[in-house]
């Protein structure tokens, strides 16, 4: 009798684990999509960087975002604010944009190789730069020792945990868009040729009003969609299935 009850419990538990595995196998190991940090204010794409006017757009809160395609392209948007220990009223801030290709090695290491001429950084140090931020090119290859994709137990959404080259975990990222919200996966600002400056209109500066207008327009130029749980086996569905199976198992346990 006890052996039959124990076997029944094992079958029920096995069924639940199988259902969860089937649900997770297709997406749980995929970094495809746009991921954003907890502030949920920093996203890759045209809302962060305008490659035509080379304009970095400051989000409302600091944060980090990565996007990955299925064919090996990535994009990064970072907005960092750090305190100034000598003068707390003068925090330093930087906005960084990079994109390029990525590869995942057999041991799980994730390497991001940026397009050298496309990276941009806007650095602000208000107590030392007389109110004029420094805008420069930026090129930094990034290596993550490993990564892990899972489901947040509180929010029921996918999370991406990146580990730095020394194994230190970064802040978790949450899936925001799938397909990803990104700028074109090609060189956006190729090195200018000698003849590209012959046209006087190419050196004409745009007004601040036109730059701001363009940045606002860019926010809507994407085919990315907000990630929604469209699968039948969502995290809530798995919870209800497991609860139901445990309930049925309890009844069968008492009956036999």
Curated annotation (Swiss-Prot):
Localization per record: Endoplasmic reticulum membrane
Gene Ontology terms: cellular component: endoplasmic reticulum; endoplasmic reticulum membrane
Domain of life: Eukaryota
Ranges for region Disordered: 186-209
GO molecular function: unfolded protein binding
Note: Present with 2360 molecules/cell in log phase SD medium.
Membrane spanning stretches: 236-256
Family matches, as PANTHER family: PROTEIN ROT1 (PTHR28090:SF1)
Record topology, Lumenal segments: 25-235
Biased composition regions of type Low complexity, renumbered to the chain: 190-200
Main location: endoplasmic reticulum
Keyword annotations: Endoplasmic reticulum, Glycoprotein, Membrane, Signal, Transmembrane, Transmembrane helix
Entry protein name: Protein ROT1
The protein's role, per its UniProt record: Required for normal levels of the cell wall 1,6-beta-glucan. Involved in a protein folding machinery chaperoning proteins acting in various physiological processes including cell wall synthesis and lysis of autophagic bodies. Controls actin cytoskeleton polarization to the mother-bud neck and CLB2 protein stability.
InterPro entries for the chain: Rot1
Gene Ontology process terms (BP): 'de novo' protein folding; budding cell apical bud growth; establishment or maintenance of actin cytoskeleton polarity; fungal-type cell wall biogenesis; protein folding; protein folding in endoplasmic reticulum; protein N-linked glycosylation; protein O-linked mannosylation
Similarity annotation: Belongs to the ROT1 family.
Gene source species: Saccharomyces cerevisiae (strain ATCC 204508 / S288c) (Baker's yeast)
Signal sequence, start to end: 1-24
